Amino acid sequence: KERIIEYIGDSYTCGYGTESSNKERFKPETENQNLTYACAMARYFDADQIVVAHSGMGISRNYNGNVKGYFMPDRYLQTYDLVKDVKWDAKSFPLKPGITVIYLGTNDFSTGMQPAERLFVKNYITLLKEIKDNYGEDYPILCVAPKNDLLMFDYIRKALDSCGLKNVHIMALTKSVHNNDSDMGADGHPNYAGHLKKAHAMIPYVSTITGWELTGNEVK
């Protein structure tokens, strides 16, 4: 396809529990990336997607503090998910996305804890610079602040305010973006209905930033 969206995320972007109800625990067979906000938004814009996502990953703190010293800014540089020493050369790849959407931070603020602001901001800027190094100074990035902690928006905004980079944007998903009953799947993750609501919230931002016009397409 002519349009491509790159997504960088965690279990939400992986589709963790999208085929579950909120009364079920997670099972691998209920993970379906095709039912995420990312795929719904790509379908809306008739775009392909590049997905760099791994459950439990954060910017400066992984879920419950697991795997210290190795975060999504490290994993983003890899060609393979579990192979650290083979780096991805984006400049040699013939296709370039039109925008990168970062949807990270939930795990940083997981289990009732908050990451150190200075390290979070530092690592977030590192990720932004990695993306710019891949695609160019003027390349657009949309940073999405998840809904689980309002402080996260301030952390991400501070990273954007101090990074010195152009064409980097921010939006926030608040707790009202979806409900905690019929929109929820396994283990506190949204199901397909919840993901569609997230996609509806993000689509106007992507349209404005990229210049891709809103269409009459159904978000599905």
Spans of model-derived segments:
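Sec-exported extracytoplasmic/periplasmic mature domains
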Residues: 13, 46, 50, 105, ...
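Generic structural signal for well-ordered alpha-helices
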Residues: 124-129, 157
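Catalytic His-Asp segment of secreted/periplasmic serine-dependent ester chemistry enzymes
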Residues: 146-220
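Surface-exposed acidic, glycine-flexible loop patches that form ligand/cofactor-binding
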Residues: 85-96, 131-135, 209-215
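Structural recognition of the beta-strand scaffold that forms the well-ordered cores
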Residues: 4-8, 13, 49-53, 98-103, ...
